[in-house]
Amino acid sequence: MHSLSLISLALLSPLLVNAQLSGHVGPLTSSSSKASTKTCNVQDYGAKADKETDIGSAIEKAWDDCAEGGVVYIPSGDYAMFSRLKLSGGKASAIQLDGIIYRTGSDGGNLFMIEHSSDFEFFSSTSQGAIQGLGYEFHKDGSLNGPRLLRFYDVTDFSVHDVALVDSPAFHLSLDTCKNAEIYNMAIRGGDSGGLDGVDIWSENVWVHDVEVTNKDECVTVKSPAKNILVENIYCNWSGGCAMGSLGADTNISDVVYRNVYTWKSNQMYMIKSNGGSGSVSNLVLENFIGHGNAYSLDIDGEWSSMSTVSGDGVQLNNITVRNWKGTEEDGAARGPIKVVCAEKAPCTDITIDDFALWTESGDEQTYSCENGFGSGFCLQDGDGTSSYSTVITETAAPTGYEASSMSNDLSTAFGTDASIPIPTIPTSFFPGATPYSALAGAASGNAAKATSSATASRFRHRRGSH
């Protein structure tokens, strides 16, 4: 168990205080304690590991017995799931997925939806549990109308860890109006198509760390409303890339940190996307990014043409820090590594771009383009946003220190949309040189009961030695 008092928090660096977690994250009770209270093995409720019998009713019955204190246990084996589950309420409970669940049936909705719950954990004690969505069965016909794999709504004090989410017909993992969550030690692997988001967050006080995402849309993305979000040690491995948005009317996002993000062969390293709208984004830090082979690098686009224009003057962006970015981009002349386009009636203010060194993989020049963005660094102009401007700077010399490490598991090609995607092994490295905050649960012990005790309770773990 790790915890950090608010007094200790105040003594840490200003960065820690101003723009990340506001308190503890994760469940309040360890899964081992929950299991000792009660364990509901789904096989005792009719589940069969035959890859044919619908496991849904067995999970529902087990949940009814263990939701108020206990663990719903899904042993190793292959299970079919035709049902679309909505598990509501409960406290001091967990779902231990050590088997593999295969989506069957063509209904949409959510394969798993957890709502109105607290002190909850969804995990695998072996790090081999998975949900296989078999989304290609929809995607090969051009359809995105299948179910999302895992969605949380109005859940507090919870974690999701050591599970793989594979080939969702739609989104993989969504956190909707949740609080005090920790997401870690996960592999998410989707098809090469838009609409197959990895992790989407519109919640408060959430820590996402040590997660790998492969898809063609969002890697780990913050949506509105959101506050106190910390995203660390992220591996966007042939993905859409991390982002914020799309942002529309009444945007309300603040105190967000992305740190140690490695992006390979993706659409962008980080994008903030809007077109019109209202509200604000404030206190955003994007630091320690490495990228290779991406179409865009830093892409702040207040006139994003891929979304319909929303009524309003634009979303106000304020106090954004971008620092320590290294690597290469695909074509720096066609799509330069810095693009900051802000609305004329809602200019971006107090933006800092520092220690930023990327170079083109094609050709011998790259551009930096800024429009109505005010602050310091590269093409940004000093000012308070009372005047408008647009400028493009062309760079013909590679910046000093742009070279950056790569990851040994970088994919050589994307996964398609017309064949089954294999279930991956959860990696033990997510960013060059960074040690994951938690060992995989399956590495702790071969004994499932002992492995569950590795889950943390009421913790606020801070970055070790990174201040």
UniProtKB/Swiss-Prot annotation:
Please give an example of a GO cellular component term from this record: extracellular region
- Please, one GO biological process term? cell wall organization
**Where do glycans attach?**
237, 252, 319
Short name of one Pfam family: Glyco_hydro_28
Which leading EC class covers this enzyme?
hydrolase
Its localization reads: Secreted
Source organism, top-level taxon: Eukaryota
Q: Where is the active site?
A: 217 (proton donor), 292
Disulphide-bridged cysteine pairs: 40-66, 219-236, 342-348, 370-379
Q: Which InterPro entries match?
A: Glyco_hydro_28, Pectin_lyas_fold, Pectin_lyase_fold/virulence
Q: Per UniProt, what is one GO molecular function of this protein?
A: rhamnogalacturonan alpha-L-rhamnopyranosyl-(1->4)-alpha-D-galactopyranosyluronide lyase activity
Please write the reaction equations for the catalytic activity of this protein: Endohydrolysis of alpha-D-GalA-(1->2)-alpha-L-Rha glycosidic bond in the rhamnogalacturonan I backbone with initial inversion of anomeric configuration releasing oligosaccharides with beta-D-GalA at the reducing end
Q: Which residues form the signal peptide?
A: 1-19
Keywords in alphabetical order: Carbohydrate metabolism, Cell wall biogenesis/degradation, Disulfide bond, Glycoprotein, Glycosidase, Hydrolase, Polysaccharide degradation, Secreted, Signal
Q: What is its EC number?
A: 3.2.1.171
Q: Belongs to which family?
A: Belongs to the glycosyl hydrolase 28 family.
* Annotated function: Pectinolytic enzymes consist of four classes of enzymes: pectine lyase, polygalacturonase, pectin methylesterase and rhamnogalacturonase. Hydrolyzes alpha-D-galacturonopyranosyl-(1,2)-alpha-L-rhamnopyranosyl linkages in the backbone of the hairy regions of pectins.
This chain belongs to the protein called: Probable rhamnogalacturonase A
Q: What is the lineage of its organism?
A: Eukaryota, Fungi, Dikarya, Ascomycota, Pezizomycotina
